[in-house]
Amino acid sequence: MDVEKDVLDVYIKNLENQIGNKRYFLKQAQGAIDEITKRSLDTEGKPVNSEVFTELLRKPMFFSERADPIGFSLTSNFLSLRAQSSSEWLSLMNDQSVDQKAMLLLQNNINSDLKELLRKLQHQMTIMDSKKQDHAHIRTRKARNKELWDSLADFLKGYLVPNLDDNDESIDSLTNEVMLLMKRLIEHDLNLTLNDFSSKTIPIYRLLLRANIITVIEGSTNPGTKYIKLIDFNETSLT
């Protein structure tokens, strides 16, 4: 143990001497540079002796020591730090119990799912763009549905119902009655029968029948009952 300490002390002492020497040489070199710079300023305009300059370049400016303890020390310190950081990283990786192959497989599956999702979204966007109509004021299907119901109510109250009014009942009351019948038709109320049309709304029944947009079906359990049903516009031609 004492031998190792003695060797270490000698090494440290040698290293300190080398550092001191390098500082001395650097100081001497800096002084020489300053002197040359000063002389060049004082002798500005005089020609430089090329032979003297060539002779100077033939001589080595610096001889590095063969042992170079400073270089060895820096290299040793760098390698020690690298070894320590590598050891810490390997220790951290060894502590993790995650299977690397499973992680890669999971990532590949996620990437595949994301790619498929993106493809479907792009396809859906293409379909939506092809069917897009210029209805910027309508934001949702619910808003569109409300707009259609409101349009139907306006049509009934402003055009159709006034032609049915016999002055015995207000337009608003008759409009509500007709609107209820139309709503039951549109929502495919299976219990809607001819008896649900009053004497004031029976003209609506005749109008729809002449337009071929309703069907009248005789009840199977009650032959005297006539059920009224709206036609399927996707399958029936109105011509």
Curated annotation (Swiss-Prot):
Biological processes annotated in GO: attachment of spindle microtubules to kinetochore; cell division; chromosome segregation; establishment of mitotic sister chromatid cohesion; meiotic cell cycle
Assigned keywords, A-Z: Cell cycle, Cell division, Centromere, Chromosome, Kinetochore, Meiosis, Mitosis, Nucleus
Disulphide bridges, residue numbers: none
Subcellular location: Nucleus; Chromosome, Centromere, Kinetochore
An annotated GO cellular component: nucleus
Keyword Cell division: yes
Record bears the keyword Coiled coil: no
Origin superkingdom: Eukaryota
Subunit structure: Component of the heterotrimeric kinetochore subcomplex CTF3, which consists of CTF3, MCM16 and MCM22. The CTF3 subcomplex is part of a larger constitutive centromere-associated network (CCAN) (also known as central kinetochore CTF19 complex in yeast), which is composed of at least AME1, CHL4, CNN1, CTF3, CTF19, IML3, MCM16, MCM21, MCM22, MHF1, MHF2, MIF2, NKP1, NKP2, OKP1 and WIP1. Interacts with CTF19.
Family: Belongs to the CENP-K/MCM22 family.
Purpose: Component of the kinetochore, a multiprotein complex that assembles on centromeric DNA and attaches chromosomes to spindle microtubules, mediating chromosome segregation and sister chromatid segregation during meiosis and mitosis. Component of the inner kinetochore constitutive centromere-associated network (CCAN), which serves as a structural platform for outer kinetochore assembly.
Other comments on record: Present with 1026 molecules/cell in log phase SD medium.
UniProt-recorded name of the protein: Inner kinetochore subunit MCM22
